[in-house]
Amino acid sequence: AGPQGPTSCRWCGRVETAFTCPACGGHALRSAVVGARRTAEELGRAFPGVPVERSGAGTVLDVVTSGPRLVVSTPGAEPVAPEGYAAALLLDAWALLDRPTLLAGEEALRRWLAAAALVRPASGGGRIVPAGAPTEVSVPAVEALVRWDPVWFAERELTERRELSLPPAARLATLTGPRA
């Protein structure tokens, strides 16, 4: 469900009407992701005097003007900086990786590479920081970003999918509809 709707299972759709935390007994839930608007507001408070621009739902910027500033954007709405960005902080990396789809890693890497391509080269001082990626395990999409090697990632994914008989190595059909 959306932010205004009831809490429900992302797999089966079952609505949870009486959530209780098994650790503390609390009943309140909060969003796991803050969102671009709130992130921009918090960065504005953390860095007073530094312009903060936001690009995403409602207003997508094509280009930002030169000069020091913080730019917060949603994936796919990254504006171009004329001299390239000094850095890209890829927030909530886990959120893209934790989606219930076979393509989650591919999609995460595609979005990260698109954002990273807007950053100055490392030789020019550019930096890319994936924040919120799991650190307790190796994550191939993050490794591919750090290595700047999407071909390695694609070959690895294809090998695994062949071994497991998953697309694109095999055909798969999904049937959806109301229960009879």
List the predicted regions and their residue ranges.
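Short, conserved charged micro-motifs
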Residues: 180
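Inter-lobe coupling/hinge segments of SF2-like helicase ATPases
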Residues: 1-176
